[in-house]
Amino acid sequence: LASEYVFRGQSQTQEDPAFQASVDYAHASGFYAGIWGSSVDFTAEDTLPEDEDGADVEIDYYVGFASDINDTFSYDVSGVYYTYPGANDGIDYDYPELIGKLTGWGWATFTLGYSWDTFNSGETSFYYNFGGEWGLPWELTLDSSIGYYDLDSVFDESYVDWQIGLSRSFGFLDVGAHYYDTNSDGELIYGDLADSRFVLTLGFTID
């Protein structure tokens, strides 16, 4: 459960709460696969019923492989297919993305995402992100990242996004609070949905 679903600095729920769930499988070899879902809302509240896109749910399917390179570095490569079942006839947002991650020193991660059919537009995009995660007293975890979403081929614009937050686990219960924002180019593409915002999350993990 999240007070809002934010993806790369943009609200995916018109700044409303989101219900989210996932099912994951991981093998000792490093192979993993899973399904992740969330409620979404891409149309403004004042949109006429006949102009609604019908996309109320996002379901992502992913497979990947992760392994250590040495005592300092590890990598993770995956493929994700973002789908939006229920979208009205003639509307198709589904698209694929390849994601590679390189993690070093146990805290720093560089991520590169590439799609050849971004938002089902037939255009390419790249996403670059650098982030870190640190343990704090009282079993808190601090994480922060900054990213650059190259959408020039899609929107003739690209933008920078960043986030910082705290999280803590209480057994099977995970609680988090994060701050998200983008630069002015993000708001040129997505308007107020890409401005600054705080998001609270509450999750349950079942092994």
Would you name each region that the model predicts?
Residues 1, 21-27, 61-65, 79, ...:
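Residues on the lipid-exposed face of transmembrane beta-strands in outer-membrane beta-barrel proteins
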Residues 2-8, 36-49, 80-89, 113-121, ...:
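Sequence/structural signature of outer-membrane beta-barrel proteins
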Residues 11, 28-92:
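Surface-exposed loop and membrane-interface regions of Gram-negative outer-membrane beta-barrel proteins
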Residues 15-19, 55-59, 92-98, 122-128, ...:
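Residues that define the transmembrane beta-barrel architecture of outer-membrane proteins
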Residues 29-35, 71-77, 106-112, 138-144, ...:
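Repeated loop/turn-to-beta-strand initiation elements of outer-membrane beta-barrel proteins
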Residues 91-151:
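Detector for outer-membrane/organellar transmembrane beta-barrel domains
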Residues 164-173, 179, 192-207:
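Outer-membrane beta-barrel "beta-signal"
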